[in-house]
């Protein structure tokens, strides 16, 4: 079972590389962002609650995310593994993921950290916002998201290093070059 956590700041290429990993290794993809955006679009209670946090550039409460994740994970019957995109974002979530997988006789295989300089992240996100119309890709919200990332999410790097699961991926360069580094890291497992 190949369970990958793909990690990096907003705009680091997690979604793009996740799609390629899914195709290459035949695993399922759980993007908490995509799941939440679908709930928002449907106008569900969960979606309305999530929208309030997202519009403010805030992280959602752990219980909310973990419930969504457990339900999505259990919907995959015959699976070679999962790539977790956008989760975990806090140490508490990483511990909850470890417990949730252990209850299913699984574990995280590797945490891939897509490392991209902040100036490049800003450029990518502003461009993405202009092209996609995503409300959370405006300059003010981007800056808030990066502050939240550095204060709440970045400590996960040390947590996964201590777990022996951390793999640094240089996130600048062509999509193909970055993907080649990812494949090399995964195939070493």
From Swiss-Prot:
GO biological process, one term: AMP salvage
Chemical reaction(s) catalysed: AMP + ATP = 2 ADP
Binding-site list for AMP: 32, 37, 58-60, 86-89, 93, 134, 145
Keywords carried by this UniProt record: ATP-binding, Cytoplasm, Kinase, Nucleotide biosynthesis, Nucleotide-binding, Transferase
Region (NMP): 31-60
PROSITE patterns per record: ADENYLATE_KINASE (PS00113)
A Pfam family the protein falls into: ADK
Gene3D superfamilies, alphabetized: P-loop containing nucleotide triphosphate hydrolases (3.40.50.300)
Cellular component aspect of the GO annotation: cytoplasm
MF (Gene Ontology): adenylate kinase activity; ATP binding
The protein's Enzyme Commission number: 2.7.4.3
Function: Catalyzes the reversible transfer of the terminal phosphate group between ATP and AMP. Plays an important role in cellular energy homeostasis and in adenine nucleotide metabolism.
Name under which the protein is recorded: Adenylate kinase
Gene name of the record: adk
